[in-house]
Regions:
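Solvent-exposed, non-membrane alpha-helical residues enriched in polar/charged side chains
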Residues: 3-4, 46, 85, 89
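Flexible "cap/lid" subdomain of the alpha/beta-hydrolase fold that forms the substrate-access gate
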Residues: 12-13, 19-21, 27, 63-98, ...
Length: 184
Protein backbone atom coordinates (compact mmCIF):
# COMPACT_ATOMS: atom_id res chain seq x y z
CA UNK A 1 0.00 0.00 0.00
CA UNK A 2 1.32 3.42 -0.95
CA UNK A 3 0.85 6.43 1.29
CA UNK A 4 0.94 9.97 -0.03
CA UNK A 5 0.33 13.46 1.29
CA UNK A 6 -1.98 15.75 -0.67
CA UNK A 7 -1.84 19.46 0.07
CA UNK A 8 -4.99 21.59 -0.11
CA UNK A 9 -4.14 25.18 0.74
CA UNK A 10 -2.32 24.98 4.05
CA UNK A 11 -3.72 21.55 5.02
CA UNK A 12 -1.85 18.28 4.44
CA UNK A 13 -4.07 15.24 3.88
CA UNK A 14 -2.88 11.68 4.44
CA UNK A 15 -3.99 9.22 1.74
CA UNK A 16 -3.54 5.44 1.43
CA UNK A 17 -3.64 4.02 -2.11
CA UNK A 18 -3.86 0.47 -3.46
CA UNK A 19 -4.31 -0.97 -6.92
CA UNK A 20 -2.66 -0.46 -10.28
CA UNK A 21 -1.79 3.10 -11.31
CA UNK A 22 -2.69 2.15 -14.89
CA UNK A 23 -6.13 0.73 -14.02
CA UNK A 24 -8.65 1.05 -16.87
CA UNK A 25 -11.31 1.94 -14.28
CA UNK A 26 -11.96 5.30 -12.70
CA UNK A 27 -10.30 5.47 -9.29
CA UNK A 28 -12.37 5.10 -6.13
CA UNK A 29 -11.89 7.45 -3.18
CA UNK A 30 -13.18 6.40 0.25
CA UNK A 31 -14.04 9.01 2.90
CA UNK A 32 -14.45 7.82 6.49
CA UNK A 33 -16.90 8.83 9.17
CA UNK A 34 -16.62 9.58 12.86
CA UNK A 35 -14.69 8.34 14.84
CA UNK A 36 -12.74 6.58 12.13
CA UNK A 37 -9.70 6.96 9.89
CA UNK A 38 -8.94 6.12 6.29
CA UNK A 39 -7.59 2.86 7.76
CA UNK A 40 -11.22 1.83 8.33
CA UNK A 41 -11.47 1.18 4.59
CA UNK A 42 -8.49 -1.25 4.48
CA UNK A 43 -10.63 -4.28 3.60
CA UNK A 44 -12.39 -2.42 0.78
CA UNK A 45 -9.02 -1.18 -0.50
CA UNK A 46 -7.72 -4.75 -0.69
CA UNK A 47 -10.93 -6.04 -2.31
CA UNK A 48 -11.25 -3.40 -5.02
CA UNK A 49 -7.51 -3.39 -5.73
CA UNK A 50 -7.86 -7.14 -6.27
CA UNK A 51 -10.51 -6.38 -8.89
CA UNK A 52 -8.10 -4.08 -10.71
CA UNK A 53 -9.27 -0.71 -9.36
CA UNK A 54 -7.03 2.08 -8.13
CA UNK A 55 -8.60 2.85 -4.74
CA UNK A 56 -7.65 5.34 -2.06
CA UNK A 57 -8.77 6.24 1.45
CA UNK A 58 -8.03 9.63 2.97
CA UNK A 59 -7.78 10.72 6.57
CA UNK A 60 -10.22 13.65 6.66
CA UNK A 61 -8.74 16.88 8.04
CA UNK A 62 -8.77 16.69 11.82
CA UNK A 63 -8.22 12.92 11.87
CA UNK A 64 -5.28 10.55 11.88
CA UNK A 65 -2.18 11.64 9.99
CA UNK A 66 -3.91 14.58 8.26
CA UNK A 67 -3.48 18.10 9.61
CA UNK A 68 -5.74 19.27 12.42
CA UNK A 69 -6.44 22.99 12.12
CA UNK A 70 -7.52 24.42 15.47
CA UNK A 71 -10.18 26.83 14.23
CA UNK A 72 -13.70 25.41 14.12
CA UNK A 73 -14.23 27.49 10.97
CA UNK A 74 -11.67 25.26 9.20
CA UNK A 75 -14.15 22.36 9.14
CA UNK A 76 -17.00 23.53 6.91
CA UNK A 77 -18.49 21.12 4.39
CA UNK A 78 -17.17 23.38 1.64
CA UNK A 79 -13.61 23.03 2.96
CA UNK A 80 -13.99 19.27 3.42
CA UNK A 81 -15.35 19.00 -0.14
CA UNK A 82 -12.34 21.03 -1.30
CA UNK A 83 -10.03 18.59 0.46
CA UNK A 84 -11.79 15.68 -1.23
CA UNK A 85 -11.51 17.41 -4.62
CA UNK A 86 -7.77 17.92 -4.04
CA UNK A 87 -7.35 14.19 -3.40
CA UNK A 88 -9.40 13.43 -6.54
CA UNK A 89 -7.01 15.66 -8.49
CA UNK A 90 -4.06 13.68 -7.10
CA UNK A 91 -5.77 10.49 -8.31
CA UNK A 92 -6.19 11.80 -11.84
CA UNK A 93 -9.00 14.36 -11.75
CA UNK A 94 -12.16 12.25 -11.69
CA UNK A 95 -13.27 9.49 -9.30
CA UNK A 96 -16.05 7.41 -7.79
CA UNK A 97 -16.68 8.42 -4.16
CA UNK A 98 -17.59 6.17 -1.24
CA UNK A 99 -18.52 7.92 2.01
CA UNK A 100 -19.53 6.35 5.32
CA UNK A 101 -21.23 8.14 8.24
CA UNK A 102 -19.80 11.70 8.33
CA UNK A 103 -17.97 10.84 5.11
CA UNK A 104 -21.33 10.52 3.31
CA UNK A 105 -22.29 14.22 3.62
CA UNK A 106 -18.72 15.07 2.62
CA UNK A 107 -18.94 13.06 -0.61
CA UNK A 108 -22.47 14.28 -1.39
CA UNK A 109 -21.28 17.86 -0.94
CA UNK A 110 -18.18 17.19 -3.05
CA UNK A 111 -20.40 15.91 -5.87
CA UNK A 112 -22.53 19.06 -5.70
CA UNK A 113 -19.60 21.49 -5.60
CA UNK A 114 -17.21 19.63 -7.93
CA UNK A 115 -19.52 17.69 -10.26
CA UNK A 116 -16.89 17.55 -13.02
CA UNK A 117 -14.63 15.52 -10.70
CA UNK A 118 -17.23 13.02 -9.45
CA UNK A 119 -18.50 10.13 -11.58
CA UNK A 120 -20.66 8.47 -8.89
CA UNK A 121 -21.37 8.59 -5.16
CA UNK A 122 -22.08 5.79 -2.70
CA UNK A 123 -23.29 7.30 0.57
CA UNK A 124 -23.27 4.61 3.27
CA UNK A 125 -25.53 5.00 6.33
CA UNK A 126 -26.34 8.66 5.62
CA UNK A 127 -28.54 9.69 2.69
CA UNK A 128 -28.24 12.96 0.84
CA UNK A 129 -30.17 15.57 2.81
CA UNK A 130 -30.76 18.89 1.06
CA UNK A 131 -30.44 22.11 3.02
CA UNK A 132 -33.66 22.71 4.92
CA UNK A 133 -35.44 25.74 6.28
CA UNK A 134 -33.93 25.23 9.74
CA UNK A 135 -30.16 24.94 10.31
CA UNK A 136 -29.17 21.43 11.42
CA UNK A 137 -28.01 22.43 14.90
CA UNK A 138 -31.24 24.34 15.58
CA UNK A 139 -33.27 21.34 14.43
CA UNK A 140 -31.17 18.97 16.56
CA UNK A 141 -31.71 21.19 19.62
CA UNK A 142 -35.47 20.92 19.07
CA UNK A 143 -35.61 17.20 18.31
CA UNK A 144 -33.20 16.14 21.06
CA UNK A 145 -34.18 18.66 23.75
CA UNK A 146 -33.45 17.07 27.12
CA UNK A 147 -31.87 13.98 25.49
CA UNK A 148 -28.29 13.02 24.79
CA UNK A 149 -27.28 13.44 21.15
CA UNK A 150 -23.60 12.97 20.44
CA UNK A 151 -23.39 15.72 17.82
CA UNK A 152 -24.72 18.26 20.32
CA UNK A 153 -22.34 16.93 22.99
CA UNK A 154 -19.37 17.88 20.80
CA UNK A 155 -20.50 21.45 20.07
CA UNK A 156 -19.13 23.29 23.15
CA UNK A 157 -15.38 23.50 22.61
CA UNK A 158 -13.30 21.64 25.18
CA UNK A 159 -16.03 19.77 27.10
CA UNK A 160 -15.80 16.39 25.34
CA UNK A 161 -12.04 16.75 24.96
CA UNK A 162 -11.59 17.21 28.72
CA UNK A 163 -13.75 14.18 29.48
CA UNK A 164 -11.95 12.01 26.94
CA UNK A 165 -8.50 13.11 28.12
CA UNK A 166 -9.38 12.50 31.78
CA UNK A 167 -9.24 8.70 31.34
CA UNK A 168 -8.07 7.58 27.87
CA UNK A 169 -7.87 3.91 28.90
CA UNK A 170 -11.53 3.86 29.97
CA UNK A 171 -12.52 5.55 26.71
CA UNK A 172 -10.58 2.96 24.71
CA UNK A 173 -12.35 0.15 26.60
CA UNK A 174 -15.74 1.67 25.79
CA UNK A 175 -14.93 1.89 22.08
CA UNK A 176 -13.50 -1.62 21.93
CA UNK A 177 -16.57 -2.95 23.76
CA UNK A 178 -18.94 -1.13 21.39
CA UNK A 179 -17.07 -2.52 18.37
CA UNK A 180 -17.28 -6.08 19.64
CA UNK A 181 -13.51 -6.22 20.01
CA UNK A 182 -13.30 -6.00 23.81
CA UNK A 183 -10.57 -8.16 25.29
CA UNK A 184 -11.64 -7.80 28.93
Amino acid sequence: MAEITVRNGDVNLHVRIEGPADSPHLPILCVHGWPELGYSWRHQLAHFAGLGYRIAAMDVRGYGASDKPHAIAAYTLSQLAGDTAAVIDALGGRAILFGHDWGAPIVWHTALRHEDKVAAVAGLSVPHVPVGDIPFLALARQVYAGKFFYQMYFQPEGVAEAEFEADPQALAKVYFALSGGATE
